[in-house]
Each structure stands twice: as C-alpha cells, then as structure tokens.
Amino acid sequence: ILFLPYIFLLFQATFMRRFEEFHDKRVRIVETFEAIEKYKEEIECLILIDDYVGSGDTLLGCINLIEEKGIKKEIIKSITLVVQKSGKEAIEKYGVDLYSAIIRNKAITDNYNKEDAEKKIQQMEGISKKLKVKNKSLYLGYKKSEGLVTMIKTPNNTFPFYWYEGKRDGKFMMAPFPRRNNVGVDE
C-alpha cells in the first residue's frame, strides 16, 4: 500500500478542515510502519490511501502488518480512487471500511449473460495465450479480477494485454500500459 502524502495534504487542507470533528485534532501524514508504531498511542483513526484496490490482497496484507504493530482494525479506514467490487467486498468482510470514487465490476463476467461471458472469457484467454503470458492464472488478471483500469503502473488485476511484456519470435513486445515503474517525475 502506498501512503500518498501529497493527496492527503490536499485532502487535509481543503476538505478535513471543513468538519468540526477535525478542528482540535492532530492530523499526521506518515509513510512508514515505523511511524505508525511511533504514534500508535495517539491514533484514533488511521486512514490508508491508495490509487487502486483489485482483489484486496495487498491492502489486507498491509492491514495485517499494521495490526501486528498493535493497531486495531476497527480504527482503520481506507480511501481509494478505484476499487474492484470483489476487492471492496473482501476488505469490508474483514471489517475495514473502504471508500472509493469508482467501483468496478468484472469486465466480462458481470456484464454479459452466462453463455456470452463464457465465450468472451475463452477469447480473452486466447489473447493471453497469443501474448505468451507464462502464468495461466493471470489470463484474466490476478485472481481473475477482469479489471479494466490503468494507472502509472498498471495493476496486474487487469487483462494482460494491457501490461504484459515479453518476447515473441525473439523480439521484445512492449505493452501499451506497462507495469514497469521506470518512467516518472523525480522530486
């Protein structure tokens, strides 16, 4: 999970100050588990911020690490820009509230009748085979998420034709939306 202080600073400055509940509260922006541990006695609410939640596995792993530091899950909240419906359900089933601007269904399974969905799933698996995606479990995205989203670093919950890069016929194939994080703005 990525704690995004620049987004949170904007959120704090423009939104949180409008609410009476925050007038007398100290808002800390932290990026490390060590900082969470350092201030754990003061934490009344811990807000985790991420750009995307797919299956929920990464967020649940982060929550588990935070719980190991002595923070109870009841005070943890998560805010994300985009979430897969199945990921939201997994997080909320665990007992953590998740708020998102956009909730995404599975691109095929949740948008077609069973017969049409099965055909389209086979087509998508065929595309993944042609791309020579090595891990068959990723043919429909991680945990069969069937995601249709891209960010600076495209999540592996999306269909592999978005992000998969490999060699085909001895030539390197570039993805339209790679998972590599080798291009960015330095601070």
Where do the protein language model's features map onto the residues?
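PRPP-dependent phosphoribosyltransferase catalytic core
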Residues: F3-T14, G61-E187
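Short, glycine/charge-rich flexible loops or terminal/linker lids adjacent to PRPP-binding catalytic cores
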Residues: L4-C45, G54-G61
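Generic enzyme active-site microenvironment
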Residues: L48-I49
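Short acidic/polar capping segments at secondary-structure boundaries
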Residues: Y52-G54, V83-Q84
